[in-house]
């Protein structure tokens, strides 16, 4: 039975404005993971990174910052800074499959170098001032790599091991390897969290049926595509047209304020959200094409209004249960 639901970090989507506005309308999430930042070699935070992790902006939400690096020294520096801000946990990103990231040996690219990863963990867990959780994939090339990775993870007191059951080269395509996740669940010495392809209540319930001992999940794209998903998993109601209209208006205004009145930039941020949210609606194919191509904020506002007025919410996500 699922007891804990984490909001996964989606780079470019679940930033500070989105997290704050989303939390005002929906619910059911226990923790919000802040999209990763990479410490600079000079141990400085960029203004953009500082804005995201500034504890003043996150203290009202239970938040966990995520760090992506292959340098133990840089990671430890980041942990010291985050502890001083008030955070009580730091998450290490070993899951990002982006080619620009993995080419530098970071994210899931670090999984291709287990000896270096072991040295990293040796230093981090001997000196770290905060509990460290890890978000990982099964490996870099093949799922069979995970057995050795799990042996490595079991040597350290990882606060929580979040497993996305794909390898780097699969990115987010193809079926997840639930047989390998079963091995993680059975053999991990650390708490395990499941992440991957949870978009409906039905998919979460199917996961619970197959793995009755799973109590912790992390959901990202599913909570953007159906903002009421976590609430429904807690027994609450699905979303409706009015709630979505109010949420999107508040989000658009939030982006406009954040970008100091630059409405064009705010509309671009909304386009990114609609990449996922459009799947909540039936009969929206034509308007979705327009969403991808709009050039002005006025065009965006017209298209969104037409979707909300004319496209029905999909019947399989509208109710409390699926």
Question: Where does each model-flagged region fall?
Answer:
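N-terminal small/glycine-rich loop or linker at the start of catalytic domains
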Residues: 1-4, 40-62, 96, 101-104, ...
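Short glycine-enriched, charge-decorated loop/helix-capping segments at active-site entrances
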Residues: 105-111, 170, 234-235
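Short, charged, surface-exposed secondary-structure boundary motifs
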Residues: 42-44, 171, 226-232
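Glycine-rich, positively charged N-terminal anion/phosphate-binding segment
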Residues: 10-81
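Alpha/beta enzyme core
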Residues: 21-26, 76-90, 94-104, 115-190
